[in-house]
């Protein structure tokens, strides 16, 4: 006869279920203003490529040419300082910089004087640069609209970018 062995009951382990993820409700606390500077508004516009027209040849730089050029933005001529390297243009075009600077009051702004040293440094290193005057500055047509939240300056900048792409 075999000895009997009493087997204790094996406790079962109940698997813990993860707690359900909390539901997060987001309430809008502020309305996005309907403004022409909103990304959605800017994306809804067209920025037609305008040809960049050279109007005046200036004295050359060390290894580049300098010009006063303009493009069209919302029916206005926007002038600026254009530098073009003397070297032959690469197959995919010159590396280009659209030089957008901070606000300078229109009554003191001079196309060929402001930021010239910076633009010269870029041009000496083989970059095509274009520094638009912005609306109402220098010889650019239209009205200067101030330093902050200017829809026209944003539009003029995007149109300048399109002009450089062609």
Please annotate each region the language model reported.
Residues 1-35:
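Ser/Thr-rich, Proline-interspersed low-complexity disordered segments
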Residues 42-92:
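N-terminal cap/lid segment of alpha/beta-hydrolase-fold proteins
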Residues 77, 93-95, 125-129:
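Loop/turn elements at helix/coil->beta-strand transitions in domains of secreted/extracellular proteins
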Residues 86, 103, 133-137:
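Short beta-to-alpha linker loops that shape the active-site pocket of alpha/beta-hydrolase fold enzymes
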Residues 91-104:
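Short beta-strand element of the alpha/beta-hydrolase
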Residues 111-131:
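Short amphipathic alpha-helix adjacent to the substrate-entry channel of hydrolases
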Residues 136-148:
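Glycine-rich "HGGG/HGxG" loop immediately N-terminal to the catalytic nucleophile
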Residues 147-166:
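Alpha/beta-hydrolase active-site loop
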């Amino acid at each position: 006869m075999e000895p009997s062995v009493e087997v204790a009951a094996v406790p079962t382990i109940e698997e813990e279920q993860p707690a359900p993820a909390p539901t997060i409700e987001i309430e809008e606390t502020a309305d996005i203003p309907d403004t022409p500077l909103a990304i959605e508004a800017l994306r809804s516009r067209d920025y037609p490529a305008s040809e960049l027209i050279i109007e005046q040849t200036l004295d050359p730089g060390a290894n580049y040419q300098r010009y006063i050029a303009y493009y069209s933005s919302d029916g206005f001529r926007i002038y600026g300082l254009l530098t073009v390297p003397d070297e032959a243009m690469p197959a995919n075009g010159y590396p280009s910089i659209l030089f957008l600077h901070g606000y300078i009051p229109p009554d003191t702004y001079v196309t060929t004087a402001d930021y010239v040293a910076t633009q010269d440094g870029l041009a000496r290193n083989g970059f095509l640069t274009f520094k638009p005057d912005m609306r109402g500055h220098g010889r650019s047509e239209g009205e200067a609209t101030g330093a902050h939240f200017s829809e026209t300056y944003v539009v003029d900048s995007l149109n300048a970018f399109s002009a450089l792409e062609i």
